[in-house]
Amino acid sequence: MTDLLRIEDLHVGFATDAGAAPAVRGVSLRVGPGEVLALVGESGSGKTVTARSVLGLLPGTATVRGRVLLGDGTSEPEEDVLTASPARLRTLRGTHAAMVFQEPSTALNPVFTIGWQLAEGLRAHGRGGGKAERRALAVEWLDKVGIPDPATRADQYPHQLSGGQKQRAVIAMALALGTRLIVADEPTTALDVTVQAEILELLHRCRTDFGAAVLLITHNMGIVADLADKVAVMRAGRVVEQAPVRDLFAAPAHPYTRELLAAVPDFGTGGRPGPETADGEVRDVVRAAGLVVDYPGRLGRKGFRAVDGVSFEIRRGEVLGLVGESGSGKTTIGRAIAGLTAVTGGQLQLFGEPLTRKSRKSKTAGRIGYVFQDPATSFNPLLTIAESIAEPLVVHQRELGAKEIRARAESLLEAVHLPRVYADRYPHELSGGQRQRASLARALALRPELVVADEPTSALDVSVQAKVLDLFGELQRELGFAALFVSHDLAVVERVADRVVVLHRGRIAEEGPTSQVLGSPQDDYTRRLVAALPVPDPVRQARRQQPVQEGVAGS
């Protein structure tokens, strides 16, 4: 079988003030017709640089050697992307290979309709005949990739489509040109789990229905188990292991691969036990009854109800997981509890007392810690890590002297397993995982009774995520704080939460003990969430998919 893509001894470096920084070191890969090769590894491993080299999308500061050969599958690949002229590259992009980016909005022009952009790609490559024919083809391809009401969507702009619909449109643009190879760089990272499942199904159809191969860049091992035929594991710019997907998961040969797989939360293997509380000690740290949160409309537009009549409680010493898709109201509830968003209706009690507009600052001051999703934007870039961690102490415990505050900040750094020398570093000098540890240290500075963690691991690599989750659990058990853990990742929630509340469009779909809700869901929406989550085991994932495929075949 001839290859569609053959990468031979690829080396890529980038010019810096300190000299050339190597990003890819001697990578060799092959992708045949109809194959899905997953390229996995942590941030900085060289995955995306390797993917961009396939389409000649590296910046001018890059120094490249090796060969990146593209073919059409009928003969040995001969087109070397690295030596192709700009005009030839424009031809190769779309016809031989196409890129699907992590954020589809960056690949779509906001001032042109979806249909126009698809038709323009056909025109630029001399496909589709006249204007009317190209328009008809655009609508046809939008329909083929599963976009509802394609004729209407063709006349809409990118901002009028959901994230999943935009990603489908980008894939349609590639398939319409007859591309044989789709390079998908983290194509589902920005999507909800159910939308992710739909895009994965579409990528599967790209090879079964349209004959395309896929080079899949991802850090999600569940997606790898669901979609890939072969896996290449990258670390520090090198491929450390390549194997068929089932072989790699069953018997990883390289220590780094074993470490990577061990760090993946394995959904369906059981959660943590609930907190042990003596009789008569149970009290609610948070109690919500008929909670309503509205966001006012602007410029004459109608307002939006983000949370609609929600009732739940968080008990002392327990972790409550709050799960649901984007727009379900998860973050809004967390912000309302922390006093960052006003409550419109219903009742919200904190520590046994009602929370009102007037009392929300006094009730929450020093008793609630908040861990934000993106630690980079929650730190002042002009303050050192020690100064940021010390801020709550400076504001709420003014009786402390400068030396004592500094000592407390350094002690908190040690508690989250960061060396004391990091105290004088600035946020940009820390990695994402280190910043999230520092964010957790700041949240715990006042020894709060409740911690609100809003998607605290969603931006982290799988191994870093595992370390942060272990740290969170260790500190929660040691300090005994209650926690609201907001996440869209069911595997993460299963690992850390005692109980789970499932939100759907601002309302509670289901709630209960974690093992019960995620192990035997009763609500249709919860069942869809659980079914949509790929597990990091090709054999188990194939068994989970079998009933779905049989249902489709029988329908």
Residue ranges, per PLM feature:
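ABC transporter nucleotide-binding domains
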Residues: 1-267, 274-535, 540-555
